[in-house]
């Protein structure tokens, strides 16, 4: 496992018990809106199988199961996050439609074309090769299915970007310090992590690697004054 992956393991293991309570802090309390918009992008009828990667505590998986009676394989590499998710799923009464899977996005334990749609959240900043990871996600997606993600974004406007920097570098670490050492570390890490990712992979480059991974009709929607983004694409013939 690479140092990037080991760091992600340590980071999320420390915040798993309080992730659903504190998580909105990291997204300006916009994460629920981003999840709903991402789910609206996938083409999955009731009874479909959807793979949710980097599922964490199951926020996306539960929304899928609740809103569309979809069956979900919720995959994450972190056992602590999956355990917290299993507890939350039981409390929510998921009706047995969510199956937790321990695994890595780069080596999915599923056959080709196993899923009608694939979603992922806050994933590509934590992998060594985003394009190869997208190829692997596309491998398990059926032809014609949709791959969709939500991720943090760096606002473009100078005033909004200045506010974003102040929030990520000052406000989040201060609140995280009040919560726990693990949350303080996570809050300090997030802003620089997002900025570094977008410096290396600006949006046109992200679109390019999605297309190079075999996804077509790639669409983007920037949300919440530029703080979040949803990207989606379809697997199949680019002319259709």
Where are these regions (language model features)?
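A short SAM/SAH-binding and catalytic strip from SAM-dependent methyltransferases
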Residues: 117-130
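A short acidic, Gly/Pro-enriched loop at the edge of an enzyme's catalytic core
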Residues: 106-117
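A short glycine-rich, Lys/Arg-flanked "PGG" loop and its adjoining helix->strand segment in the class I
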Residues: 131-143
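Class I SAM-dependent methyltransferase SAM/SAH-binding core
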Residues: 49-107
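Core SAM-dependent methyltransferase catalytic element
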Residues: 213-240
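Conserved beta-strand signature within the Rossmann-like core of class I S-adenosyl-L-methionine
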Residues: 145-152
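C-terminal alpha-helical "lid/dimerization" subdomain adjacent to the S-adenosyl-L-methionine
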Residues: 6-7, 154-209, 213, 219
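Conserved alpha-helix/loop element of class I SAM-dependent methyltransferases that forms part
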Residues: 28-46
